[in-house]
């Protein structure tokens, strides 16, 4: 199977998101455990967890698009998963590392985008007639 340019880009993004989730997880476990409070470490870990979960979701959406390249709803879901993940996880990383509580107000935007993305993804899968 020949991957189109968009598929290659999103597969590379997925691989980089997974690599960075592993790196952030290790950084949190080893580099931040003596710096952050237990509560802030838990918040940081939540960002890592959701980055892992949504990286798998992004991979799934990308594979589905490779199988159904003309399904625009899949592409919308894929993009929302990526944007939602970046907003959600990065806001938690910065909130904890830089001690910027204001970023806590941004985190739910990322979470909401993730929820919308997976609802669209489910709809796209169920309504696919190709």
Task: Tell what function each PLM region has.
Residues 1-130:
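Polytopic transmembrane helical bundles with strong interfacial aromatic enrichment
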